[in-house]
Design a protein with these regions (language model features):
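Binuclear metal-dependent phosphoesterase catalytic core
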Residues: 55-59, 182-278
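Short, small-residue-rich loop/turn micro-motifs
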Residues: 75-78, 132-134, 206, 249
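Active-site environment of divalent metal-dependent phosphoester hydrolases
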Residues: 1, 7-8, 14-22, 80-82, ...
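Residues that flank catalytic or metal-binding motifs in active/ligand-binding sites
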Residues: 50-52, 67-70, 124, 170, ...
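Structural recognition of the beta-strand scaffold that forms the well-ordered cores
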Residues: 6-12, 16, 55, 70-74, ...
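His/acidic metal-ligating clusters that form di-metal
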Residues: 70-72, 85-187
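Short, glycine/charged-enriched secondary-structure capping and boundary segments
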Residues: 23-29, 87-88, 142-144, 188-191, ...
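Extended active-site neighborhood of metal-dependent phosphoesterases/phosphodiesterases
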Residues: 2-120, 223-229
């Protein structure tokens, strides 16, 4: 956060098990984040579980007032004793039903607003970010594209089916962290077979910080950060309606595992041969 302030870059944050497990109350933490220079953090509705369930809209170049993307950020809570018969340790709280209801009502209200403003046929994409992965990230049938699985998915054993709400709302991708040496983007088979209007893509960010582990089972992985690029046609060489992602790897300049998630305003599925580990 300090680095982004020095560079005068707007930033935002979501709550994770790393903050939820601390003594400082979430509300107080959010107040601190809001006071930082260039911070876009918001506390979110008081009647929704967790702190920091909110959305940000990205608009086209001025003088346009048309939103080209909506970014949703959700609190993924903290660690809990296992709630299933499976000996699962650690286990984590799932996304709560109040959060799913908030996401659905908000996304549909924003959709209706775009329709009322005559923007229904214009490019718009939605991306969700949360720290702890959904249970779907652990599906053994995932079709991976760009990147690899370096460790098992560590997420909630209880599935509250937030993924189904993402499908219904037409979300292009969900990005998460938590599992430091996973860095893939993937689709469930039923979404892959759609060829188009698939999604959401399930994308890991990889290990970014130097204060965290970056190895598993004795194997070291390069630290990396996932970059998301949204094309809105502001530049002559920029494609409108395209969303790309890749990882920037420690000590390397080239893009790794670059993939087009959305092309011509359509979430892509079955896009070709999967990428190997990079």
């Amino acid at each position: 956060m300090k680095g982004s302030g020095r560079c005068r870059v707007s930033d935002t944050s979501m709550f994770t098990n790393l903050r939820a497990d601390k003594e400082l109350a979430g509300k107080t933490q959010m107040e601190i984040l809001q006071d930082l220079p260039y911070s876009l953090c918001q506390p979110g509705p008081a009647n929704v579980d967790g702190v920091g369930n909110y959305y940000l809209q990205i608009f086209g170049a001025a003088p346009s007032t048309r939103p080209v993307a909506t970014i949703y950020l959700l609190d993924s809570h903290g660690q809990i004793p296992s709630t299933t018969n499976v000996n699962r340790n650690p286990d984590y709280e799932p996304i709560k039903h109040s959060q799913i209801a908030w996401f659905w009502s908000t996304s549909q209200a924003l959709r209706r607003e775009r329709e009322d403003n005559g923007d229904a046929d214009s490019f718009h994409t939605s991306i969700v970010f949360q720290h702890i992965p959904l249970p779907e990230f652990d599906d053994p049938k995932l079709i991976m594209h760009a990147g690899c699985r370096g460790e098992p998915t560590e997420g909630p054993s209880q599935n509250t089916y937030f993924y189904d709400a993402l499908v219904g709302a037409g979300v292009a991708a969900i990005g998460c962290g938590h599992d430091h040496v996973n860095n893939f983007c993937a689709l469930l088979p039923e979404q892959w077979r759609k060829k188009e209007k698939a999604g959401p893509w399930l994308c890991y960010g990889g290990c970014f910080g130097f204060g965290a582990y970056c190895e598993y089972d004795g194997k070291r992985y390069w630290r990396r950060a996932r970059v998301w690029e949204l094309g809105v046609g502001m530049k002559d060489d920029e494609e409108e309606g395209v969303v790309r992602t890749w990882t920037r790897v420690e000590y390397q300049k080239e893009r790794k595992g670059e993939i087009v998630l959305v092309n011509n305003d359509t979430v892509q599925g079955g896009a070709g041969d999967s990428y190997g580990s990079k």
